[in-house]
Structures are given as structure tokens and as C-alpha cells.
Amino acid sequence: RILFEKRIERLPLIDENRRIHGLVTRKDIRFLRERPFASKDRKGRLLVAAAIGARGDFLERASELLRAGVDCLVIDIAHGHSSVMAHAVEQVRGRFGAVPIIGGNVSTTDGARFLKDLGVDAIKVGVGPGRGCRTRLETAAGVPQLQAIREAWWAVEESVPIIADGGVSHDKDVFLALICGASAVMLGSALSGTDEAPGLVIEDPMP
């Protein structure tokens, strides 16, 4: 209120000893009003996770991402219930300590339990349900997404968050994933056409 009434851009927050503890700007207030449910850290910055894979230079990628300020690392491969995943999680934990790790992808009870036992902080569930994933086409193996979410929940219940990855074509898919046990839902194609999404903009040639 003070910012808008006095038409000032910044308002420092001080204690009784006149020590500055923070700074509020009109941009901060506008952001809070427009995006009240955004996930932010203690400094008010958006939380960011980045994928590093599980082979090759994944440790170097993790190091550079953490240096850039990433909050969480995503170790994801097509088949997360594997020795490759176990090795990657062990290496990341050994090198970077308690950094939050999301592991995936799995689609079975055993796979979810495997990732839980590895000590990941969240489990990514889904093998092939999304438009961009070719695992089912190339291997002829996969589990329907809602069944995969439910099996993962049976394995870990409330102990580890489950992230439903893929298969969201309509708003009802988000609802179904959440009631089946997912704590969060990843969106790919649903957001790929937005202005904020990276990639080339291809305009319709037809008038």
C-alpha cells in the first residue's frame, strides 16, 4: 500500500536498530498477486530443477547446474529400476551431499520401492505415456499411467512424493493422477505451445 500510495519503487525493511533485513519492490508485489501459488525459495526466487541423466558427464552437469543455483537435480533414464540409476544416485550423493534428488522413471511397485531404498527425495513415474516418449514403441513394454501411479503409491505410500510424468492431454488427467496417489504432475505438450516455453515458433502458413 505504501509503495503504490507514495509512488515509490522500493521499500527497505528495517528493525528497531535500523538494520536492513529486506527489500520489497512493486515488482515483488505484482508477482505475488499474479502468481500466488508459484513455488519459491526463502529468497522469493522460483524453485528450479534440472535433469542431468545418469551416464557420461552427468556429474559435471550437476556441478555446473548447482553452481548456477539449481534447487534440485533430476536423475532420469528410460528404465529407472536399474544398476545405472543406483550408480548415478550413489555418485551424486557422494559428490554433492544432501542436494534434493528426483529419480525416475519407473512404472512398477518394485521400481518405486527400489528408488525409495536408494534414498531419492521424489519418484518420477511413467514409462511411455507422453507424446515425446518412444519407450513403449521401441521396446513393446509399458504400464498404463494410472496403474503405474497406483503401484508406486502402494510401494511408498506417503513416505516419498510421487511425480506423474506424461500422459496429460486434458485437465481430467491431472485430477486422475492426483487421486491415484501422485503428489505432483509434470506437463509437457500441455505447456509446449506457451510463450514461455523454449523452442522454435512455427506460424501457420494458412491465412
Regions from the language model: what does each represent?
Residues E60-A68, I101, V106-V125, V168-S183:
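Catalytic cores of alpha/beta
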Residues D41-A51, V92-S107, A122, A155-G166:
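Short beta-strand/loop segments at the ligand-binding rim of alpha/beta enzyme cores
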Residues L3, E9-V24, A49, L73-D76, ...:
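Cytosolic beta-strand hydrophobic patch enriched in CBS
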Residues F4-R7, N17, R42-G44, R55-G56, ...:
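Short flexible coil/turn linkers enriched for glycine and charged/polar residues
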Residues R1-R7, I14-D15, F31-R33, D57-E64:
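The conserved cystathionine-beta-synthase
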Residues A51, L118-D121, A140-A164, V168-P207:
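Alpha/beta catalytic cores of nucleotide-metabolism and tRNA/nucleoside-modifying enzymes
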